[in-house]
Amino acid sequence: MRVSKYLLSTQKETPANAEVISHQLMLRAGMIRRNASGLYSYLPTGLRVLRKVEAIVREEMNKAGAIEILMPMVQPADLWVETGRWEKFGPELLRFKDRHNRDFVLGPTHEEVITDLIRKEVSSYKQLPLNLYQIQTKFRDEVRPRFGMMRSREFLMKDAYSFHLDVDTMNETYEAMYNAYSNILTRMGLAFRPVLADTGSIGGSMSHEFHVLAQSGEDLIAYSTGSDYAANIEKAESPVPTEPRGAATEELCLVDTPNAKTIAELVEQFDLDITKTVKTLIVVGASEATPLVALIVRGDHELNEVKADKLDLVASPVEMAPEALIRDAIGAGPGSLGPIGLNIPIVIDHSVSVMSDFAAGANVDDKHYFGINWERDLPLAQVADIRNVVEGEPTPDGSGIYAMARGIEVGHIFQLGTNYSKSMNATVLDENGKSQVLLMGCYGVGVSRIVAAAIEQNFDDRGIIWPEAIAPFSVGILPMNMHKSHRVTDIAEQLYKDLNEAGIDVLLDDRKERPGVMFADMELIGIPHTVVIGDRNIDAGVFEYKNRRTGEKQDIPFDQLLDFLKNAVKG
């Protein structure tokens, strides 16, 4: 490709409304342009990267035995009513009517459509297992689209759905998809971690997320220093204490604490060990019989709302109770709450169950109890894992301790079981002629999100540093004063021809531009390998080569350059 015939829409200045580096660089490098909130057009450079990501995804899905199809972006609302998600999904589901007043949605996902398709097309166990995928545009009406392609309203996604009659083949397909996703990200040259994950609104049992590691990642990943164990912070299991509860050494004491509204203030004013304090959080209960539930974690720990959401007593999704409701029921406000004398159900974290001589609110404003001990001052409450893990704690596999990293979720695989097939009556006849509800798996990759995540992991102060496999161009040719030197022109054109014939994506900057502008554009758009051609190089019989990632420069003799670049591009 010649720059003179190409839409290279680079920008020097960082757009003011771009919050994260991938958004900034995708705009500056001329990859995307905003059309409306959360809606973007891909310019040539951006589309080249997107298509390379898409091609790798497609190749690995095909190798794993999945079959490509294409489903409509517009979906009939009847299917969503059938699964109950018409009401559950919320305002992210864009709903509209056609000219005949029939309800439709703009698809954020395709479980309903694929299940409807399979129940009509598959009738016998002999047709199973089956794994179908598509690469299709999705739309989610995010309340606040932000971060460019990281959280846009319209995005490109690969979603696959598998159908089974037995758990064994579902597990086999799940493992195949796990390996395919690992291969996809490995081929793209990205540092990533698969992590155990919560199934969220899609539902199901087994679930893994695939995270591209980046300091800007929204998700916190807890992983073992001694094994492959890793989990989203929402899913990471807290260790169950192995040491017995310490004996009581203090008397229960009611203390005035007028200026201690938070754990931090309580600890500072009374010189307490924070691990000897607890936080009492009041959430909405699951029934009229239990309108409020108290959740108690140690003072230095944080409540994990995903874990709390799974408690039978707690309403889903978890909702903190309003202060007025708390005061009506308990007689005190947040900051003065604790387990003694509490007239609502209590669930405590494992770490709280082994505490002794601890401090908590007294359920009277501006008062706390010090020296609280279980089974002396109050009965032991229901115990569950309801907190986030912290760095340095032992991991559940016993092979190491927790460390933390930030990641950007780009893939998610689920075992859905019968969540959708049962509600939509997707059944087949087994080998005995009996009707069986299909088991399902669901496997998603954010194709456009991978592009942004790759930038978040690969950039410097000059621009993007693309991994080889997804770079828009592999080689950039920079002829110095091309329009003034026939020698430079001839050699640049010959190299351009040779690289094209070798199947290497090459960009020839044939503009009448200053060298500084040409260098800056090549570095901004992240071309991995650049070759500089000038009269001085020609006189010396060498090309000047520069590696974008390492910054290494070297002179390559004319007769060696083509082989050198072929090897460099192959990695």
Swiss-Prot record:
**Where exactly are the transmembrane stretches of this chain?**
none
Example GO biological process term? prolyl-tRNA aminoacylation
Where in the cell?
Cytoplasm
Main subcellular location of this protein, as a coarse class: cytoplasm
Q: Which GO terms describe its molecular function?
A: aminoacyl-tRNA deacylase activity; ATP binding; proline-tRNA ligase activity
Under SUPFAM superfamilies, the record lists:
Class II aaRS ABD-related, Class II aaRS and biotin synthetases, YbaK/ProRS associated domain
What this protein catalyses is: tRNA(Pro) + L-proline + ATP = L-prolyl-tRNA(Pro) + AMP + diphosphate
Q: Which InterPro entries match?
A: aa-tRNA-synt_IIb (IPR002314), aa-tRNA-synth_II (IPR006195), aa-tRNA-synth_II/BPL/LPL (IPR045864), Anticodon-bd (IPR004154), Anticodon-bd_dom_sf (IPR036621), Pro-tRNA-ligase_IIa (IPR002316), Pro-tRNA-synth_IIa_bac-type (IPR004500), Pro-tRNA-Synthase_IIa_type1 (IPR023717)
Lineage top rank: taxon: Bacteria
Q: What is its EC number?
A: 6.1.1.15
Task: Enumerate the Pfam families for this protein.
Answer: HGTP_anticodon (PF03129), tRNA-synt_2b (PF00587), tRNA_edit (PF04073)
Q: Name the keywords, alphabetized.
A: Aminoacyl-tRNA synthetase, ATP-binding, Cytoplasm, Ligase, Nucleotide-binding, Protein biosynthesis
Give Gene Ontology CC terms.
cytosol
Q: What protein family does this chain belong to?
A: Belongs to the class-II aminoacyl-tRNA synthetase family. ProS type 1 subfamily.
Q: What does this protein do?
A: Catalyzes the attachment of proline to tRNA(Pro) in a two-step reaction: proline is first activated by ATP to form Pro-AMP and then transferred to the acceptor end of tRNA(Pro). As ProRS can inadvertently accommodate and process non-cognate amino acids such as alanine and cysteine, to avoid such errors it has two additional distinct editing activities against alanine. One activity is designated as 'pretransfer' editing and involves the tRNA(Pro)-independent hydrolysis of activated Ala-AMP.
Note the subunit structure: Homodimer.
UniProt xrefs under PANTHER family: MITOCHONDRIAL RIBOSOME PROTEIN L39/PROLYL-TRNA LIGASE FAMILY MEMBER, PROLINE--TRNA LIGASE
UniProt note: domains? Consists of three domains: the N-terminal catalytic domain, the editing domain and the C-terminal anticodon-binding domain.
Q: What is this protein called?
A: Proline--tRNA ligase
The species this protein belongs to is: Shewanella baltica (strain OS195)
The organism's taxonomy opens as: Bacteria, Pseudomonadati, Pseudomonadota, Gammaproteobacteria, Alteromonadales
The gene that this protein is the product of is: proS
